[in-house]
Design a protein with these regions (language model features):
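Catalytic histidine-centered segment of alpha/beta-hydrolase-like enzymes
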Residues: 208-219
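Acidic catalytic loop of the alpha/beta-hydrolase fold
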Residues: 181-185, 211
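Short beta-strand/loop motif that positions the catalytic acidic residue
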Residues: 170, 176-178
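Active-site nucleophile elbow and catalytic-triad environment of alpha/beta-hydrolase enzymes
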Residues: 151-166
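Conserved HGGG/HGGXW glycine-rich cap/lid loop of the alpha/beta-hydrolase fold
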Residues: 12-63
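Active-site loop/oxyanion-hole signature of alpha/beta-hydrolase fold enzymes
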Residues: 43, 53-92, 219-223
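Short alpha-helix in the alpha/beta-hydrolase fold that links the catalytic acid
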Residues: 172, 186-194
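Flexible "cap/lid" loop of the alpha/beta hydrolase fold
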Residues: 101-108, 113-143
Length: 233
């Protein structure tokens, strides 16, 4: 059964969509999308799990605060903290694209809080300042494509190398899913994560595009996530 619950963090309201019961799995979507992108995966997993899909600020049914500070990585991580603390037991984070970066950032800055992490078509950011600025410049050029206000799209910008610098220290079990037909930068990032993280496993899904969890590979991804969670200690 699908249940909607609003969580408030420092006057910021976050819509969450909850299904099922059991060991919790929290889903974090990418920029310009919403919790609905995980509907198929969450519905399948809700047979044995509590699934919680989050609308980030300014996305889906979560209002868009006027304060630009709501659209920073640290604010997003604080939002996740409140959602995770509302659960009865530690969760597994599943994040796509920007959501995957946030899941990695959470594991990097809050060791031991979550049971595991699953990332789909994402990367850990950039250590090279020039690469970061190149990413940020491209993000700014393409803001209009994401269908969100400029202040909301600020969430996609990179400002430091916190995640890159701490990859080797992330002891949290991590499943890295990459679409075989997504852009090469994501397959490169997936390989990098598997090499640098102490407990990461890479799976490449043939024919999968950037949003493969929404349609073509939803059932396969749900099975991979279920098996991953079942294997956690």
């Amino acid at each position: 059964m699908r249940r909607r619950r609003v969580v408030t963090v420092k006057d910021v309201q976050l819509n969450t969509v909850r299904r099922g019961a059991g060991a919790p799995i929290v889903f974090i979507h990418g920029l310009g999308t919403s919790a609905a992108t995980f509907d198929a995966c969450a519905t399948a997993l809700a047979e044995h799990h509590l699934t919680v899909a989050v609308d980030l600020p300014g996305h889906g049914d979560s209002p868009s605060p006027e304060d630009t500070e709501a659209f920073t990585r640290d604010a997003a991580l604080a939002d996740l903290d409140v959602i995770l603390e509302s659960l009865d037991e530690p969760a597994v984070l599943v994040g796509h694209s920007l959501g995957g970066y946030l899941a990695l950032a959470h594991a990097a800055t809050r060791p031991g809080v979550v049971r595991g992490v699953v990332v789909l078509n994402t990367g850990p950011g950039f250590r090279d300042p020039d690469k970061r600025e190149e990413w940020n410049a491209r993000s700014r050029r393409n803001w209009h494509r994401f269908g969100v206000p400029e202040r909301v799209a600020e969430l996609n910008l990179q400002h430091d190398a916190v995640v890159m610098d701490r990859l080797a220290d992330i002891a949290t079990a991590t499943l890295v899913l990459v679409g075989g037909d997504d852009r090469p930068e994501f397959s490169g990032a997936g390989n990098y994560l598997e090499r640098k993280m102490p407990d990461a496993r890479l799976v490449v899904l043939d024919g999968g595009g950037h949003s493969m969890h929404e349609d073509s590979h939803a059932a396969e991804i749900a099975t991979l996530v279920a098996d991953f969670v079942a294997g956690l200690h």
